[in-house]
Amino acid sequence: MTNRILIFANKTWEADPLVGVFRNDQARPPKFPDFDTPPQSTIPLNDGSTKTVQARLVLKSTSATAELWCIKDLMDPARSASSSEEKARVLPYVTAIGPSPSLVIAFGTATIANANSYNGSVVVGSSVFVHNPYSAAPNPNSRWTHGDIGKFLDSSQQPINSAIFPSLDRDRASVEARMLPTPLNPAKPPILIPSASYVALSNVNVTNFNDYVWADPEAMDACKAAAPKQSVGSVETTHGVVRLVVPSQQFIFVSGIANRLGYINMEVAPRSYAQNFAASHNAAIALAWSIPALMA
């Protein structure tokens, strides 16, 4: 049976650079899988209607298919684009149109908890910790809950790690040579930061960006308390939603670093499109150079 890989990009500004890199023979590795016909999924909306959404692209090898979906494409436009609850509602409709995936990849921009700038760098890891900063007082715009919130989910020993992480180490020079600098406080230069032990820390149900000021440090403290020996690779909102909602034997996250923790208003907001584009593009380069090993 052909393995099914599901790639979920969070927002359109993350999916668009990923598609561009996958289709550009100057950006991707020379031995890249062929493209196939994208599937469609019908998504019920909250007003009782439906919409049909097509995968952004599909890759096919002799042993695997890889579908790229944009979560924002799937969501009800009447709901907040940052709603973890809405993201969790729509993801199962993609899972349901095919066999259970053997690998799920969460892709998007993120922050990093480091005083030094790694803006434009790319973190690749496999483990997850999800924190809900509104557990005591639910956010009316996103009330998502799950039994694994607050638990450390360790994927550091999964079999696929022996393929992707050595591959990234071998191809580091090719990946980093294609990276773009971010316009604001760029890493000099941006680098590839892969480790199977890295944790994606997902802070869920945040729909007001001003809340990141207190919610992200709270999430860091919660992760440290639950998994004191683990290293947080990136902090964002959605990798963990994908991990908890889409059942899979294996999981990888790819985070393009757009800003330092606590600096979104200084390092993203003034040049939001360009900052996020560069971070997403660089993450796309890293994922593209991983694809041959993942689909072998």
Task: Indicate where each model-derived feature is located.
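Accessory terminal and edge-of-domain segments that mediate assembly/interaction
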Residues: M1-A296
